[in-house]
Curated annotation (Swiss-Prot):
One of its GO terms (biological process) is propanediol catabolic process. Interacts with BMC shell proteins PduA and PduJ, which target this protein to BMC. Interacts with PduQ, probably via the N-terminus of PduQ. Interacts with PduK, probably with its BMC-containing N-terminus. The keyword NAD applies. This is Propanal dehydrogenase (CoA-propanoylating). Keywords: Bacterial microcompartment, NAD, Oxidoreductase. GO terms for molecular function: acetaldehyde dehydrogenase (acetylating) activity. Belongs to the EutE/PduP family. Changing residue 7 to A: Substantially decreased protein levels in BMCs, no change in enzyme activity. It is found in: Bacterial microcompartment. InterPro entries: Acetald_propionald_DH-rel, Ald_DH/histidinol_DH, Ald_DH_C, Ald_DH_N, Aldehyde_DH_dom. Bacterial microcompartments (BMC) 100-200 nm in cross section are formed during aerobic growth on minimal 1,2-PD-B12 or anaerobic growth on 1,2-PD-tetrathionate medium, but not during aerobic growth on glucose, anerobic growth on glucose or pyruvate-tetrathionate. BMCs can constitute up to 10% of total cell protein.
Length: 464
């Protein structure tokens, strides 16, 4: 090969190298959707490094844009979620989506604390962790993704979502929408990512990945336990079995309406919903009558047995009936459905009935009569199983309300209202769908997904 031919070859090679697209970083097949877990997390890590350089106003801009652009999509997302998962109803899912979008706090949750004295000044501020691995459930898929995205992006993190395979389509659609909104606000791709095929194995890979700084797990006890074994910091939102106490001083009309509204909400899918009703015997009959006026159907003992056999075979929830309507449950049990579809099924049962002793996620509320308030509180403590999740009580006796709250030690305690008031729906306070009871964070917000840092200036800077 002569000099002229060699120069020609070199020019050709250089030309090809300059015009051939780089193979890294790996590009997603959709907005934030990758083929492999490693590709997705690596992309999210690179996005985080750039996001760290952005001012707080950029985070606020992303959240503001999310609130504006996702609002008209909340109803379609709710309908798609109900259709894909086969659980819950689109009307209540819309309300949950709206609460998550409107009531999840942003950067304003990252409050700064300063202490000054003769020795100088100490500043406490919240900083991001990095890439957070967030596991979302099929029971609350879109609302969890919206809620977690706002909280985690506000805290300065990037996010790898591990959605439930049963809510794959709607979850991936929403993740792509949020990724695109974030990109348009800050010019950074892949702040929110996932994989095209979310599986249990993919979740395991994510939990073991060295670039995942924190795990936020919204799901059952099994997936939370798996996360605990990862050796990483875990913010774990596990199961609950919320009891509802009604004593003889309660406003029975309001209590009946609140209980029906809470226990029927999204067909009882929320983990904070009333799962059992414990009522003082002297007012039990009147309360049940009032509940029927608000749309509850009281089952006979025979029909209760039929329903239990179908919905709780061997004492365990029939997954095919989780999150189904009361009418669908009746049909499955061979029980006639009234002309006016009931909002909630109720039945008088014993304290050891399977409907009472564990979380079922179905719109059937077991009612247990007890002799007095002390007995009600003792049973509620047993039913709650030490999960420290949620409890509800209806009473006009402030001392009893206070005693129940102190005794049950739940992350959420709702007094004289529907259960969903505890997450900012029809009640005060911010909204969250990640209630970290096993790991103790309780109702999570942006500051939950940030680490507290201490900056010290010595020798002065106190002007007192």
């Amino acid at each position: 090969m002569n000099t002229s031919e060699l120069e020609t070859l070199i020019r050709t090679i250089l030309s090809e190298q300059l015009t051939t697209p780089a193979q890294t970083p790996v590009q997603p097949q959709g907005k934030g959707i990758f083929q492999s877990v490693s590709e997705a997390i690596d992309a999210a890590h690179q996005a985080f490094l750039r996001y760290q350089q952005c001012p707080l106003k950029t985070r606020s801009a992303i959240i503001s844009a999310m609130r504006q652009e996702l609002t008209p999509l909340l109803a379609p997302l709710a309908e798609e979620s109900a259709n894909e998962t086969g659980m819950g109803n689109k009307e209540d899912k819309f309300l949950k989506n709206k609460a998550a979008l409107d009531n999840t706090p942003g950067v304003e949750d990252l409050t700064t604390t300063a202490l000054t004295g003769d020795g100088g000044m100490v500043l406490f501020e919240y900083s991001p962790f990095g890439v957070i691995g967030s596991v979302a459930p099929s029971t609350n898929p879109t609302e969890t993704i919206i809620n977690n995205s706002i909280s985690m992006l506000a805290a300065g993190n990037s996010i790898y979502f591990s959605p439930h395979p049963g809510a794959k389509k709607v979850s991936l659609k929403l993740i792509s929408l949020i990724e695109e909104i974030a990109f348009r606000c800050c010019g950074i791709r892949n702040l929110v990512v996932t994989v095209a095929e979310p599986t249990f194995e993919a979740t395991q890979q994510m939990m073991a990945h060295p670039r995942i700084a924190v795990l936020a797990i919204t799901g059952g006890p099994g997936i939370v336990a798996m996360g605990m074994k990862s050796g990483k910091k875990v913010i774990g939102a596990g199961a609950g079995n919320p009891p509802c106490i009604v004593d003889e001083t309660a406003d029975l009309v309001k209590a009946a309406e609140d209980i029906i509204n809470g226990a029927s909400f999204d067909y009882n899918l929320p983990c904070i919903a009333e799962k059992s009703l414990i009522v003082v015997e002297s007012v039990a009959e009147r309360l049940v009558q009032q509940m029927q006026t608000f749309g509850a159907l009281l089952l006979s003992p025979a029909d209760t047995d039929k329903l239990r056999a179908v919905c709780l075979p061997e004492g365990q929830a029939n997954k095919k009936l989780v999150g189904k309507s009361p009418s669908a449950m009746l049909e499955a049990a061979g029980i006639a459905v009234p002309a006016k579809a009931p909002r909630l099924l109720i039945a008088l049962v014993n304290a050891d009935d399977p409907w009472v002793t564990s979380e079922q996620l179905m719109p059937m509320l077991p009612v247990v009569k007890v002799s007095d308030f002390d007995s009600a509180l003792a049973l509620a403590l047993k039913v709650e199983e030490g999960l420290h999740h949620t409890a509800i009580m209806h009473s006009q006796n402030v001392s009893r309300l206070n005693l129940a709250a102190r005794t049950l030690q739940t992350s959420i305690f709702v007094k004289n209202g529907p259960s969903y008031a505890g997450i900012g729906v029809g009640g005060e306070g911010f909204t969250t769908f990640t209630i970290a009871t096993p790991t103790g964070e309780g109702t999570t917000s942006a500051r939950t997904f940030a680490r507290s840092r201490r900056c010290v200036l010595t020798n002065g800077f106190s002007i007192r």
